Amino acid sequence: MSKGKIIVAMSGGVDSAVTAGLLMEEGYEVIGVNLRTWEYEAPVCDTTKKSCCSPEDIRDARDVGLSLKIPFYVVKMEKVFQEKVIDRFIDDYQHGKTPNPCVECNTFVKFGALFEKAKALGIDKIATGHYARIVRNGERYAISNGVDIGKNQAYYLYGLSQENLKNVTFPLGGMTKPEVREIARRMGLSVADKAESQEICFIPENDYRKFLEKKHVEFTPGFFKLRDGRIIGKHKGRENFTIGQRKGLGIAWRNPLYVIAIEDDGSVILGEENETYAESFSVIDVNYQGFAPLGEGESFECRVQVRYRHTPIRCRITKMNEDLVVNPLEEVRGVTPGQSAVFYPLNSDYLLLGGIIRKGSIRMQVAKEESAIAFRS
């Protein structure tokens, strides 16, 4: 007996292929969908480079659909991808931030827009090949990391709504990558040993600076400064830098220097290693998953992860106006505006909430005040 229809987002990789195969074995009527998000036109992209969502990946996804004997469709998502991912990517760099396009893509395209397409077809359920699980915390749903510690992808999924979480399934959450490849071989899938892409899909050369140049973005030149306001050099564009960066500065100094702030006027503030640690920072555009929205002034302890592959640390968060103020209780460096911060309970691995790191921390704000005094004197 059929369990009903389900849409599987098929990228052309082994993970989504096995997801489709497993759901078929469970009795679902699987419909494969590939999301065409990006027009691969020269000279912006070199299609000979390996990246996800490429024409090669679409062909691989279609081949898997034929092998599994399931309906397969390519759905055009270029417009929403341009608005929600690429335009934001460019805007963030133009404002001194370091964007996280994979988070935006998951939130607005792979789940947001795909769910809308599914509902238009009268289908409630979708599935993807993410290594994640869904748990319940009381009346709320939340993402939890998968069992494969090398593939934990909860960080990229904090933007999913409660409605999304009720209707999505992740069949690979309880598996490891080697196990998934072995299942693909058993199923006779052509992508069983296909290499993974590590690049942003619309930047196959993994060079965002070249991408910005080809999109005719005007870089904002300025000065390299120390925290006390001293000018120690010039640069050709703040878009070339990110918080925590050490290489490629071209500044000779007695000790290694790191980017610790990027200013609105184009100034790039440099400091030594001990100046890279955040005292506090704020988070905006918060989405709550396993935790009910905080009231004004409410506060509690949890753990925060400030980038992918970062080990979560203890912190205290407080709701202030529309923002969350985060006070780390352990040392953390490289807190980067534009990147995502996600929060977990102290003793569990499911997501409480997440949001975008806003520019500045208390430590950096103090530095700005000191710099202003230095310039006035």
Curated annotation (Swiss-Prot):
Organism superkingdom: Bacteria
Active site: 105 (nucleophile), 201 (cysteine persulfide intermediate)
Binding site for ATP: 9-16, 35, 129
Cell compartments where the protein resides: Cytoplasm
EC number of the protein: 2.8.1.13
Sequence segments annotated as region (Interaction with tRNA): 151-153, 307-308
Site features described as Interaction with tRNA, chain residue numbers: 130, 339
NCBIfam families: PRK00143.1, trmU
Protein name from the UniProt record: tRNA-specific 2-thiouridylase MnmA
S-S bonds: 105-201
Role: Catalyzes the 2-thiolation of uridine at the wobble position (U34) of tRNA, leading to the formation of s(2)U34.
GO cellular component: cytoplasm
Originating gene: mnmA
Catalytic reaction annotation: S-sulfanyl-L-cysteinyl-[protein] + uridine(34) in tRNA + AH2 + ATP = 2-thiouridine(34) in tRNA + L-cysteinyl-[protein] + A + AMP + diphosphate + H(+)
Pfam families in UniProt: tRNA_Me_trans, tRNA_Me_trans_C, tRNA_Me_trans_M
Top EC category: transferase
GO molecular function: ATP binding; tRNA binding; tRNA-uridine 2-sulfurtransferase activity
Keywords for the protein's UniProt record, in alphabetical order: ATP-binding, Cytoplasm, Disulfide bond, Nucleotide-binding, RNA-binding, Transferase, tRNA processing, tRNA-binding
